[in-house]
């Protein structure tokens, strides 16, 4: 249930002696809404000692957030719409340092001609899964454990145009998406990497630096001297991997790579959905061009069925990575590695894809996932659900990152009211295959179990 704050801005204008006639001729509404979710979560195999970790997290079933929805009636069945959404961690009150202040921010028009929106929005991959074959009937996904989002190419897109058209009965819904890259490139990453090479005390790197005339540049060759060029490549690998693994990063490269990864990327895609008589079917596809020139092609299809108290869903996702080809130059290699890191961030982490895809020339370039789930409304207030995900990764030249991953979660949600509920969930992750397949680089664990208990309120 959302708290409606009727025409706050118009009322303020009227109080100043302005806009009364406008308020009467153009009905509008402003809604302030939000979700506050906090949970205690315990996980195993954490850190180098592979111990247990118990902590309070700022979102177990849903990420805490608040937002503003605006609608203005333009007449003739048309209306203007705007949406702002800020996400935060309820345990600390802080926003996520790696995310923009507004996770969603868009404006648009809606009418008989369809719906056109512009801004930072959910991408079409997320849209089709969340609206058609979501993991749980009471929540599209569990925020503390969401391997399905690792296949959604970041889930949100900056600088996006989206056009949606539906049949009058909304049995058929289709959306097209295009976004602009807008000068998001790797130049800042190259600058920091060159600085690291020039500051390195590694004897081999210093020897190559001397052979290059005493200084590395973005256009400097990285393999021009036998037996020494590989050392330069390894230094670049180390700097980029350090940032990717969230370890110590004295060069400041970590922040630059994350900044590039959060920036606008060129995308094009769409989805189509059919829904009637409890059955929903959908499919979507999207290409993302990364800042260094690589392409990520993502596809998904699936469906769900509701019958009485039961909810069933199944889906398939495919990510195919097409890396940029790099020449024998520092800048070209940085482009290659930066794109790899951005992809790996999409694929990694126990809550978002579950295991590493690799950073370097032996990295994987293909990931597939199937998902199967069931939900049951045991009572008017109690919902239970179970979900299984199976992922397969391939394309690693030496097999280091080839393998499989299983994700399982059992969850129960009890509603005290329409706005307040309590939930509990048990999840388990297991990866197998090449030596590089780990849940996280700190623990290098291949299995992990989590228990989450939380409280959520919506207003």
Across the structure, where does each feature detected by a protein language model lie?
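Repeated loop/turn-to-beta-strand initiation elements of outer-membrane beta-barrel proteins
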Residues: 78-80, 113-116, 169-176, 278-283, ...
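Outer membrane beta-barrel
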Residues: 25-42, 53-183, 273-277
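Outer-membrane beta-barrel "beta-signal"
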Residues: 414-416, 445-459
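Detector for outer-membrane/organellar transmembrane beta-barrel domains
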Residues: 229, 250, 258-407
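Gram-negative bacterial Sec-dependent N-terminal signal peptides
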Residues: 1-24
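Residues that define the transmembrane beta-barrel architecture of outer-membrane proteins
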Residues: 54-64, 100-103, 112, 155-159, ...
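Outer-membrane beta-barrel architecture
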Residues: 67-69, 106-108, 162-164, 271-273, ...
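Transmembrane beta-barrel strands of outer-membrane/channel proteins
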Residues: 36-40, 84-86, 120, 176-180, ...
């Amino acid at each position: 249930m959302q708290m409606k704050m009727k025409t706050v801005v118009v009322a303020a204008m009227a109080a100043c002696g302005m806009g009364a006639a406008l308020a009467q001729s153009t009905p509008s509404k402003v809604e302030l809404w939000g979700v506050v979710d906090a949970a205690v979560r315990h996980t195993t195999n954490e850190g180098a000692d592979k111990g247990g970790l118990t902590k309070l997290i700022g979102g177990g079933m849903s990420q805490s957030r608040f937002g503003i929805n605006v609608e203005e009636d333009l007449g003739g069945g048309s209306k203007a719409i705007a949406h702002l959404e800020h996400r935060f961690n309820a345990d600390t009150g802080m926003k996520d340092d790696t995310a923009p202040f507004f996770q969603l921010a868009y404006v648009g028009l809606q009418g008989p001609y369809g719906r056109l929106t512009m801004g930072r929005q959910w991408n079409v991959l997320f849209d089709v899964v969340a609206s058609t074959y979501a993991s749980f009937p009471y929540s599209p996904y569990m925020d503390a454990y969401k391997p399905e989002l690792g296949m959604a190419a970041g889930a949100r897109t900056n600088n996006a145009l989206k056009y949606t058209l539906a049949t009058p009965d909304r049995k058929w819904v289709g959306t097209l998406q295009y976004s602009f890259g807008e000068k998001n490139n790797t130049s800042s990453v190259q600058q920091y990497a060159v600085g690291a090479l020039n500051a390195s005390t590694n004897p081999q790197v210093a020897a190559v630096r001397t052979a290059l005339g005493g200084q590395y540049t973005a256009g400097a060759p990285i393999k021009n001297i036998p037996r020494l060029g590989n050392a330069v490549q390894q230094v670049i690998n180390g700097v980029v991997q350090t940032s990717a693994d969230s370890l110590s990063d004295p060069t400041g490269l970590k922040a630059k790579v994350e900044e590039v990864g959060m920036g606008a990327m060129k995308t094009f895609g769409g989805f189509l959905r059919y829904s009637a008589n409890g059955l929903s079917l959908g499919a979507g596809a999207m290409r993302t061009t990364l800042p260094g020139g690589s392409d990520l092609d993502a596809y998904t299809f699936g469906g769900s069925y509701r019958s009485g108290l039961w909810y069933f869903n199944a889906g398939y996702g495919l990510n195919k990575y097409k890396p940029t080809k790099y020449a024998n130059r520092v800048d070209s290699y940085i482009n290659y590695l930066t794109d790899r890191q951005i992809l790996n961030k999409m694929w990694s982490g126990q809550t978002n894809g579950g295991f590493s895809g690799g950073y370097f020339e032996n990295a994987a370039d293909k990931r597939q996932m199937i998902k199967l789930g069931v939900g049951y409304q045991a009572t008017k207030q109690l919902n239970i659900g179970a979900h299984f995900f199976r992922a397969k990764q391939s394309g690693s030249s030496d097999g280091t990152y080839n393998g499989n991953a299983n994700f399982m979660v059992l969850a129960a949600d009890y509603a005290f009211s329409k706005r307040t509920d309590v939930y509990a969930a048990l999840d388990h992750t297991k990866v197998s295959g090449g030596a590089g397949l780990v849940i996280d680089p700190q623990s290098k664990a291949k299995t992990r179990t989590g228990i989450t208990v939380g409280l959520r309120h919506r207003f």
